[in-house]
Structure formats: C-alpha cells, structure tokens
Amino acid sequence: MAKFGSRNKSPKWISNGCCFLLGAFTALLLLWGLCSFIIPIPNTDPKLNSVATSLRSLNFPKNPAATLPPNLQHDPPDTTFYDDPETSYTMDKPMKNWDEKRKEWLLHHPSFGAAARDKILLVTGSQPKRCHNPIGDHLLLRFFKNKVDYCRLHNYDIIYNNALLHPKMNSYWAKYPVIRAAMMAHPEVEWVWWVDSDAVFTDMEFKLPLKRYKNHNLVVHGWEGLVRLNHSWTGLNAGVFLIRNCQWSLEFMDVWVSMGPQTPEYEKWGERLRETFKDKVLPDSDDQTALAYLIATDNKDTWREKIFLESEYYFEGYWLEIVKTYENISERYDEVERKVEGLRRRHAEKVSEKYGAMREEYLKDNKRRPFITHFTGCQPCNGHHNPAYNANDCWNGMERALNFADNQILRTYGYHRQNLLDKSVSPLPFGYPAA
C-alpha cells in the first residue's frame, strides 16, 4: 500500500505545478493589460500619434448638458406660477416674489437655466393701425428687419408687438405693459431690452457689455449730472433701455407708470414734472421725464443705485449728429482691414461674433461705429416730425442709417452698397477692401 501511494505522488505534483504556472501566466497577462491602460505603450505610427494628439487637444465640456440647446418639448407637470389663477400679466396687479417664482421655473426646466444669466430678449413694436405717412409702413418694416438681423447675429430672441395691451396706456407709455407681459412669458431670459421702432442698430458686431451692468437692474443712455444737477429732461433717453427680469424691475415699473395716463393723478404729474424740469417741452407726463424725476429726486437711493446711466458709448445716439459720419467711419474700418488680413477673411454668418471680437483690439484708439442711431423726433410712421427738423433730413438720414447697417449684413453674403442713398448693390471682390 505504501508503494502504491508513492507511485501516485509524482503525477499529482506535476498537475499542481501546471495549474500554478497557468495561473501565474494568466495573472501576468492581466497585469500587462492593466499596465497598458495606465502606462500606454509608445506608438511609433506618426499618423496615429497625430490623431491621439488632436483628440487630447479638444476641450470637451465637463457638463455636456450645458452645451445642448434648450429642450422646447420639456414642460413637466410640476406646479409653477403659471398654474396660479391669481397670477396676472397686466400692470393692474402687482407681482410678488417674482425672483423665487422664476428660479423655481428654471429648476423645472434645467436646459434653459444653463444660459439664463446672459439671455436677452429684445422687445420692440408699433401702433395697431397703419401708418399715415405714405412710406411709414415701409420704413417700419426696414427698421424691424434691422433688429431681426442684429438678433440673428447674436442669437437673441425678439418680440414685435403691435397690440395695445392697456387701453389707456398709449404712445410712449404703451411699452410697459408689453415689457411686463414679456417678463412673465419668458422667465428663461435675464434681460429684456426695449428698443424703439425708430432706432437702428448701426454697429452690428457690438455686444452689450453685460459684466459692466452686473450690479444694476436698469441701463439707460444718459448723464447723471444733467439729470440730478441741471434737471434736464433730455439728460437721458427712455427710448432704448435694458431692464433685468427680476422683482426689483417689476416694482420699479409699478412706481414709474404711476405717473402714466391710466392714473387719476396724470394731469398733476404733468404739472409737477414741468415744475421740476424747466426745459420740458411736452405738457403731459411722459415716461422719459418720469424716469428722470425718479432719479433726480431719489435722495435715499431707493432706486438710483440700481440704475446705470450709460454715457461711454452710443447705447442710443442722436441721429442728427451721427448720420453725417458714416462714410468716414467706414473708411476707418476699411483702413484697419487693409492692414489685418484676418479681418478680411470670408466667413459664415454664424461665426460673425468671432470677427467682431477680433476687431475690438484695433478699435481701442479709434472711433468705432455708433451702436444705435435713434431718430427721435422724426416720427417715421405718422410723418409729423419735429418742426425743428427738415423732413428730407429725417427721411434721408433713415435711409443712410439703414443702408449703413445693411452693408454690414450684406458683406457676409458677398455684396454691398457703394452709395448709402442708393438701393442698388454690387458684388464684393475677393480680399475686399484690400483688393
């Protein structure tokens, strides 16, 4: 029995040894495979190396959802302010806790929240009836096209309203019910940008410096000295303004429009505004003088600290002093492009912002295009322009401004107008303006 046992020891030892070697070999294979992931084996193929380098150089976003477009089909059943029957779009009933309600809506719609901080909605409009000026409707169409062009370049949404939302708030007061309703209809936007129908974007590349206004809720073109010290009603212009979509703005507009024609104190406010602003021409209470009054008399900084009076660029500019400068400005821009080949490069319209940003460094010491040319007093729709202006100056000025702006759009399509008072266009040669 002892001999039988000794004869079977050797095969068992060999079998165990084979299993050990097989296991060790498998472990080595696994270790080698793991190391190949942690410490990549150098690749001698230059083509593969080039591809790998290119992939590593791509800056993929940490949060891919942040780069996706808003989901227009997502509206969960969660209750929001829209489901509250007490919520009113009109200015007759104050809105409360708007910041919290807007924030809650954005939490339920996260695809909108990623870009909400800088999102702008441009709002403009005109009266419900046709224009009495024979060319008025044509001019309003061209003014609107100009705004659509600007919004398309910068990916802004735009609303054109021609409905009177409050029967008593007409003329210059008509815009405030529209702005109030737009804020509620668009909780995804941070800013609402009102631009009068008779205002033209004449620098299509320029973007609002929103960081400059991060601590403010209302931006208006104006000068504090003229408003607070001189008490001039033209110390600011309320035809173009940027207002934040927040509770402060809703409360401020409630105070602002309390001087409007829908209130029983309307006539008294007209008298008070004329007493405060001796240069006021209009007898009635108007929104521009009302805003100036709130700024000039706000000694406790109830509102003033959140209002930014912009005077460093043409947030909106007086047309009479601007329209005669277009040709000289165009020549200055052409001069820069002759020196900088990159600015002359043809490109898709969708990437126009890149070239606008590139141009900025060459405009620091030069006069840039006026951002917005505002035809105050020209009344393109009814034709009843300010008697201080010549009618032809108004109509020719509008034509020049619209064509000056349109040239900036047409260039991307390979055309331009040589004469700002001529509607005909010509193809641009390759390499323009150096060609």
From Swiss-Prot:
<keyword id="KW-0333">Golgi apparatus</keyword>
<dbReference type="InterPro" id="IPR008630">
    <property type="entry name" value="Glyco_trans_34"/>
</dbReference>
<dbReference type="GO" id="GO:0071555">
    <property type="term" value="P:cell wall organization"/>
</dbReference>
<comment type="function">
    <text>Galactomannan galactosyltransferase (GMGT) involved in galactomannan biosynthesis in seed endosperm. GMGT specificity is an important factor regulating the distribution and amount of alpha-1,6-galactose (Gal) substitution of the beta-1,4-linked mannan backbone.</text>
</comment>
<feature type="topological domain" description="Lumenal">
    <location>
        <begin position="42"/>
        <end position="435"/>
    </location>
</feature>
<dbReference type="GO" id="GO:0008378">
    <property type="term" value="F:galactosyltransferase activity"/>
</dbReference>
<protein>
    <recommendedName>
        <fullName>Galactomannan galactosyltransferase 1</fullName>
        <ecNumber>2.4.1.-</ecNumber>
    </recommendedName>
</protein>
<dbReference type="InterPro" id="IPR029044">
    <property type="entry name" value="Nucleotide-diphossugar_trans"/>
</dbReference>
<feature type="coiled-coil region">
    <location>
        <begin position="321"/>
        <end position="354"/>
    </location>
</feature>
<keyword id="KW-0961">Cell wall biogenesis/degradation</keyword>
<feature type="glycosylation site" description="N-linked (GlcNAc...) asparagine">
    <location>
        <position position="328"/>
    </location>
</feature>
<keyword id="KW-0812">Transmembrane</keyword>
<keyword id="KW-0735">Signal-anchor</keyword>
<keyword id="KW-0328">Glycosyltransferase</keyword>
<keyword id="KW-1133">Transmembrane helix</keyword>
<feature type="glycosylation site" description="N-linked (GlcNAc...) asparagine">
    <location>
        <position position="230"/>
    </location>
</feature>
<dbReference type="GO" id="GO:0005768">
    <property type="term" value="C:endosome"/>
</dbReference>
<feature type="topological domain" description="Cytoplasmic">
    <location>
        <begin position="1"/>
        <end position="20"/>
    </location>
</feature>
<dbReference type="GO" id="GO:0005802">
    <property type="term" value="C:trans-Golgi network"/>
</dbReference>
<keyword id="KW-0175">Coiled coil</keyword>
<comment type="similarity">
    <text>Belongs to the glycosyltransferase 34 family.</text>
</comment>
<keyword id="KW-0472">Membrane</keyword>
<dbReference type="GO" id="GO:0000139">
    <property type="term" value="C:Golgi membrane"/>
</dbReference>
<keyword id="KW-0808">Transferase</keyword>
<keyword id="KW-0325">Glycoprotein</keyword>
<feature type="transmembrane region" description="Helical; Signal-anchor for type II membrane protein">
    <location>
        <begin position="21"/>
        <end position="41"/>
    </location>
</feature>
<dbReference type="Pfam" id="PF05637">
    <property type="entry name" value="Glyco_transf_34"/>
</dbReference>
